[in-house]
Amino acid sequence: MDPILLGGIVALSTILVLFSGVSVALGLLIVSTGFLLIFDGLRSLELIPEILFGKLDNFALLAIPMFIIMGSSIASTRAGADLYEALERWLTRVPGGLVISNLGACALFSAMSGSSPATCAAIGKMGIPEMRKRGYPDGVAAGSIAAGGTLGILIPPSVTMIVYGIATETSIGRLFLAGVIPGLLLVGLFMAWSLYSTWKSGDQQLLSSRVYTWKEKFEILPRVLPFLAIIIGVLYAMYGGIATPSETAAVGALLCLLIAVIIYKLWNPKDLWVVLRDSTKESVMIMFIIAAAGVFSYMLSSLFITQAIAEWI
C-alpha cells in the first residue's frame, strides 16, 4: 500500500479512536498496535515494551512531576486569592483594573505552576465572581481568565515545554528562555487592550467604589513576596547555570510545599495527601502519553509513513 494513503488511514483511525472517548495515551497505543499487527506481524509487538520503557528512561522527565507538585501545592492554598487581591488593591481605580488584575495574577501563577488548568482554576475562583459583582459582562470575566490561563504554556516553567523538549530533543532551558519574552508581550498586550477598551467605553460603574489606603496596599505585599522569590530563584538557578531544570524543579517543589505548610497552614495530612495524589495522577497521565507517542512514532517510521511524507513535502 502507498505510504501516503496509509498515513491518511492512520490519521483517520487515530481521530476516530480519540473521538470515541478513549484516553489519548490508550488511543495512540490501540492504533499503533493495530497497524503494527496488520503490517508487521507479531514480531513487532516484542519491541513495544522496550519502546515504552525507553521513552520514560529520561532524566529530564523528573522535572514534570516536580513542577506539577509546585502547581498543586500552590493551587490548594489561598495563594491565587492573595495574588489576585494584591493586584486588585493596587489597580482598583484603574479603568479595567479587575481585568488587568486577573491577567497579572494569571501570569504570576503561571510562573509558579507551569500549568494552564491550575492557573484558570485558582484565579478564576476569585476573579470571575468579583467581576460579576462589579458589573462586568460574563464574556469579559470568563475571557480574561481564559486568555490569562493560556500564559501557563508560554511562561516558564511550562510543563508543555518540557514535554515538547523531550519529544523533540530540544534544550528545555532554551525553550523556557524562548517563552519569556512572548509571554510577557502577551501579558502586556492583553492588559493594554483591557485598559483601552474599558476607557473607550467610559463605563464608570466598572470602577470600584472602594478606595484602598496605602497601608492596605502595602500590608498585603508580604503574602506575595515568597512566591515572587520562588519565581526569581527558579529562573535564576536555571539560567545562571547553577542547576538543571530537573534539579531546579525539585527545589521549587520543596519550597512550594514548605510555603503551603508554614504560611498557609496546610498541616492536615489529608490535604497533603490530596496534593501528592493529584500530582501523581497528572504526572502518570503525561508520562503515559509520552510513552504511547513513542510507540506511535515507531509505527509511523516502521511503515515508512514518516519518510514518504517528508519526501512528498
Predicted regions and their residues:
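Alpha-helical transmembrane segments of multi-pass membrane transport proteins
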Residues: 1-313
